[in-house]
């Protein structure tokens, strides 16, 4: 069974208090994300990571404060979540070469990761039998990712102690919606590497 670990938006602007759109207490999940990513790479499990990469005048800033502007400190993934040998796929249509990359970082500009021009092709090329999802924000990008992945008909597990939300109530609603929609919920200790 081929597993893909899916690391959603583990970027400085979301994870750290100095970030432009800090998610309360999100820095607490950085070690869990880092361990998941390193463990996956050590066992040959692909890590598919997403990152916001906004323009300075991005339309999303009418809803949210400016954050993850391409090239800024806050747009970069937390260093601990990076895997050596990674590749980055920009937020524009392009050729994709995934062979041998332990971590594939896909840039996006919207909360729905499946609107990124390359994500569906990457998911198709990885041809997973199941997905393990973690990152930020539980009730926004993580939820969109899980909904999109569930449409593939493959099992999706959310690692509940490796996600962070804006509020506990929003997190509980999102996780219940994921479970009710066919997703599985598990903790870091319950997730194997195969």
Residue ranges and their predicted role:
Residues 35-39, 140-151:
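Histidine-anchored nucleotide/phosphate-binding helix
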Residues 88, 185-194:
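A charged, well-structured terminal subsegment
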Residues 12, 55, 164:
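Short, glycine/acidic-enriched loop or turn micro-motifs at the edges of active sites
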Residues 31-130:
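Active-site alpha/beta core segments
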Residues 132-135, 154-168:
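A short glycine-rich beta-strand->turn/loop micro-motif centered on a GG-aromatic cluster
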Residues 18-26, 63-68:
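Short glycine-enriched, charge-decorated loop/helix-capping segments at active-site entrances
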Residues 6-8, 51, 160:
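Active-site flanking residues adjacent to catalytic metal/cofactor-binding acidic residues
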Residues 1-5:
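Extreme N-terminal starter segment of soluble prokaryotic enzymes
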């Amino acid at each position: 069974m081929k597993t893909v670990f899916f690391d959603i938006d583990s970027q400085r602007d979301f994870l750290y208090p100095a970030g432009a759109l800090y998610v309360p207490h999100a820095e607490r999940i950085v070690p869990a994300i880092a361990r998941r990513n390193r463990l996956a790479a050590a066992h040959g499990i692909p890590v598919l990571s997403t990152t916001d990469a906004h323009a300075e005048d991005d339309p999303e800033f009418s809803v949210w404060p400016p954050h993850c502007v391409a090239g800024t400190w806050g747009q970069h993934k937390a260093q601990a979540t990076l895997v050596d040998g990674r590749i980055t796929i920009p937020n524009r249509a392009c050729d994709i070469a995934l062979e041998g990359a332990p971590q594939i970082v896909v840039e996006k500009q919207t909360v729905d990761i499946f609107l990124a021009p390359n994500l569906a092709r990457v998911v198709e090329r990885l041809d997973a039998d199941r997905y393990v999802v973690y990152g930020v924000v539980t009730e926004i990008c993580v939820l969109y990712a899980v909904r999109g992945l569930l449409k593939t008909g493959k099992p999706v597990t959310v690692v509940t102690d490796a996600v962070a939300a804006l509020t506990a109530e929003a997190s509980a609603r999102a996780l219940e919606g994921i479970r009710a929609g066919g997703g599985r919920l598990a903790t870091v200790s319950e997730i194997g590497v195969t």
